[in-house]
């Protein structure tokens, strides 16, 4: 509160020409007060009638010689100088490189800060100017609009980030579920395949056992039939060594359908002629 009061009071005793605390303040007939040096330099720069002067604030004409010292303002300025401003309140002062005066105006055409002497020079005469504070305030308002837009964009980006994080979490969980489902499905299929494999292997083992048993029986029968065949061959060879009378006598003694003939079975790989011959000899 006190800081705002001091600021307002300082504005009341600030020269409208140099925008600094007034030095040797003088007041015109219109009531506006200026630094004696600033208003004198301004009066000389505009090269007007030496008797008539136009106030740079309200543009009212008055006699330059009617300027009078303002002791009240001077006393206030002296008291303000006793108060040391805080670092936050202190601002760096920028002066005109050409005239050494404070840069308190802004030329809108040339887009540059100027002093009040620059405004009256040939370079900037007739250009639209405004106080730096006013232009700065305009820029601050524009920057505020930009800042609001940027903050809105920032909010959108934060929401976007949240959405991305939600999507990441969703897809991580979804893919994890899919991985579990795939593993479960393939395990089920492997269990089925393992069961089928066991069944098929059991069938093959049983088939092998049956085949081997059949082969064993065939081998046993083969051995028996081979023995009988060898016996028949031996008998035939023996009969061939006998005389005709003995051969006929042996034949008469053999009765068809004897046990030896019933026991012998022709093997499937013997030709029909051999089987016929063996049977004939056996029955002779």
Curated annotation (Swiss-Prot):
SMART domains: BBOX, RING. CDD domains: Bbox2_TRIM5-like. A zinc finger (B box-type) spans 91-132. The keyword RNA-binding does not apply. Its main location: cytoplasm. A zinc finger (RING-type) spans 15-59. Residues 130-234 form a coiled coil. PROSITE patterns: ZF_BBOX, ZF_RING_1, ZF_RING_2. Keywords: Coiled coil, Cytoplasm, Metal-binding, Zinc, Zinc-finger. Pfam families: zf-B_box, zf-C3HC4_4. Zn(2+) binds at residues 96, 99, 118, 124. GO terms for molecular function: zinc ion binding. Gene3D superfamilies: Classic Zinc Finger (3.30.160.60), Zinc/RING finger domain, C3HC4 (zinc finger) (3.30.40.10). It is found in: Cytoplasm. It comes from the Eukaryota. One of its GO terms (cellular component) is cytoplasm. Expressed in embryonic CNS, liver, kidney, olfactory epithelium. PANTHER family: E3 UBIQUITIN-PROTEIN LIGASE TRIM. Belongs to the TRIM/RBCC family. This is Tripartite motif-containing protein 12A. It comes from Mus musculus.
